[in-house]
A protein has these predicted regions:
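N-terminal Rossmann-like NAD(P)+-binding domain of SDR-like oxidoreductases, especially those catalyzing
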Residues: 1-218
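A conserved pocket-lining segment of Rossmann-fold NAD(P)-dependent short-chain dehydrogenase/reductase
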Residues: 105-106, 172-180, 207, 212-214, ...
Length: 257
């Protein structure tokens, strides 16, 4: 089937795109390469060598399967997003096109505004475009369990909605689980799920919103096929996940705390 992967050049998007192509799907990566630009802004980079996007795609086509690249900023160019969906007619879109680092989202005013503008507007643009073009397109979104916070006060987190009883009316209701985001980034993921709930309720969009834990690691079966397919390995204090930093410290004989 045809699958569009928004943010397919990033840490999660790239190996996902390769996996989908390896399974026989026709994959279109859509990305504005913002993660590479942020590397320059922070004067940091991946521990692994990341090939230019053109080399990445050529290598993926040679070793993996049917995969293409479209440069597009879906936050700033909703018309371009609509044109792409009309042209490609995907069965599913996978949405990774968001600034993903909680520490980055808390650096300062510019980073806070960029994270909110990019993440929430990109999500809304996808939903709005699908309403106009084809409501049968499936949306798969990578959220984060961080929208719930890390307190034990609210108890275990259920799948789907939380069933409650409203005291004043004694009526039962299904609501989104209580949010307690710890950063601007996590807050945007909570706002995303409000957007998704609204579009599902009013237009019946088919949406899978995944709230997973920390994603970590280096390689997959596909990224290991050729040097140009190598995935990111961020180990800095902004984009490096705690697992990656622990791995880097252990490899250098440092004690992990």
């Amino acid at each position: 089937m045809k699958i569009v992967v928004f943010g397919g050049d990033g840490f999660c998007g790239w190996p996902t795109s390769l996996k989908l192509a390896a399974e026989g799907h026709s994959v279109v990566i859509v990305d504005n390469l913002s993660r590479r630009a942020i590397d320059e802004q922070l004067s940091s980079g991946s521990l692994t060598n990341i090939a230019p996007i053109k080399q990445r795609i050529l290598s993926a086509q040679k070793f993996v399967g049917d995969i293409r690249f479209e440069f597009l900023d879906i936050c700033k160019d909703p018309a371009g997003l609509g044109n792409l969906l009309r042209r490609e007619k995907p069965h599913t879109v996978v949405h990774f096109a968001e600034q993903r680092a909680a520490p980055y989202s808390m650096i300062g005013d510019g980073e806070r505004r960029y994270t909110v503008d990019n993440n929430v507007t990109s999500t809304h643009n996808i939903c709005s475009a699908i309403v106009e073009i084809d409501r049968n397109i499936n949306i798969v979104h990578l959220g984060t369990m961080g929208v719930y916070g890390y307190s034990k006060v609210f108890g275990s987190i259920p799948e789907g909605y939380l069933n409650i009883q409203i005291k004043s009316t004694k009526k039962d209701a299904d609501v989104l689980y209580l949010a307690n985001p710890g950063s601007i980034y996590h807050m945007t993921k909570y706002l995303d799920q409000l957007v998704f709930q609204f579009y599902n309720k009013n237009w019946g969009l088919k949406i899978t919103d995944l709230h997973q834990g920390i994603v970590w690691g280096t390689e997959t079966a596909q990224t290991s096929l050729a040097p140009d397919l190598t995935n990111r390995f961020d180990y800095d204090g902004i984009y490096g996940t705690v697992m990656n930093r622990f791995i880097s410290q252990a490899a250098n004989g440092m004690v992990c705390h």
